[in-house]
Amino acid sequence: MCKPRGPKLKTYRPRRVLDWTVKLLCRQAADEKDFKKTSTYSKLDVEAMHSSFFFNNAPIEEAEASSQPEAPFLLPLKKISIFFAKKNYLYNKGKFSRNKQTYRTGVYLCIWLTVLTVVGLYFYFYLMSMKFTYNYLLFLFFLGLFFYKFFIKKNNKKFEVHTDLFENF
């Protein structure tokens, strides 16, 4: 239910302009013209309403004073609908707003990429290597031949030391 902010109707103090704007936002969009024509406002708050740009086009009628203290502050609630509230900035900051949904989408994307990467790397490095180890044997054989030749030459001392580059310095 859309409730106005500020003091309740049981005081003689004038209502705040914010209270009237909240009540005006609670009407149905189709009833806007009828609402402005038939609404009555407090005569104590007429000057504040005239100073507000929101009420420049709204006809303001002074309520007739009666013996009841609440009479100058009455706004007929039958003429406004409490089932309509304008979507404002606070409303859009809810559960499924654009910013929060974008954030969630990014988080879920990172989680799925992590899962796919871990599963893929596990499959590639563990399952593939366990199933197809014989493919690496040829590579390891040629690598072993290189180191074998290196150690044979080192033990036979057939290395030539080239110091030509350093003689000019």
Curated annotation (Swiss-Prot):
A Gene Ontology cellular-component term: mitochondrion
Superkingdom as given in the UniProt entry: Eukaryota
Keywords, in A-Z order: Mitochondrion
Cellular compartment(s): Mitochondrion
Main location: mitochondrion
Protein name per UniProt: Uncharacterized mitochondrial protein ORF13
